Amino acid sequence: MNNMNIIIADDHPIVLFGIRKSLEQIEWVNVVGEFEDSTALINNLPKLDAHVLITDLSMPGDKYGDGITLIKYIKRHFPSLSIIVLTMNNNPAILSAVLDLDIEGIVLKQGAPTDLPKALAALQKGKKFTPESVSRLLEKISAGGYGDKRLSPKESEVLRLFAEGFLVTEIAKKLNRSIKTISSQKKSAMMKLGVENDIALLNYLSSVTLSPTDKE
């Protein structure tokens, strides 16, 4: 089996440590870089001979952003780099939008010790990886009748930040878009999800996330 060079990006040092220790148990994996913000990650990518990037969805870095914005930048400028998203965000609408970016895998942090090795093994065989836990979450969209009303990546990014507690003005600044654009994208997403106000939106985002009984 060919060796796989991997970069890890997460803004929590303890998470970086845990992932690295887990990957060190796989003899054909080499960790060639670790970064805590997107700016350092992007600045160093050209210098590293990496096959795979394992990155958190929410990560600081003013210049290149995070989440879907960062992933799209990497896909555009480093097309040969495989991407596995590691995230605490278990909202199915957002996970669906991330998968639409044609990444190689997505892993919830709750299941990372088990699912990351599986994702890398799938990559070795030229396959993509979606764990059962994520597949179950995505089924909730279809069960709720929203399967034919998929959020666009930009709408998903706005909802992700809204769910994290950011105001529309703060989201606009973070994503370098106008307040009017952010408001329009938020409204469009709400119409697709069938919710009429912010309280209903937050209730929806909460209700379709992973419940304790769903965790593996």
Curated annotation (Swiss-Prot):
Domain Response regulatory positions: 5-124
Task: Give coiled-coil spans as residue ranges.
Answer: none
How would you describe the post-translational modification of this protein? Phosphorylated and activated by RcsD.
Protein keywords: DNA-binding, Phosphoprotein, Transcription, Transcription regulation, Two-component regulatory system
Q: Could you tell me the Gene Ontology terms of the biological process aspect for this record?
A: phosphorelay signal transduction system; regulation of DNA-templated transcription
**Residue numbers of 4-aspartylphosphate PTMs:** 56
Q: What is this protein called?
A: Transcriptional regulatory protein RcsB
Q: Which gene encodes it?
A: rcsB
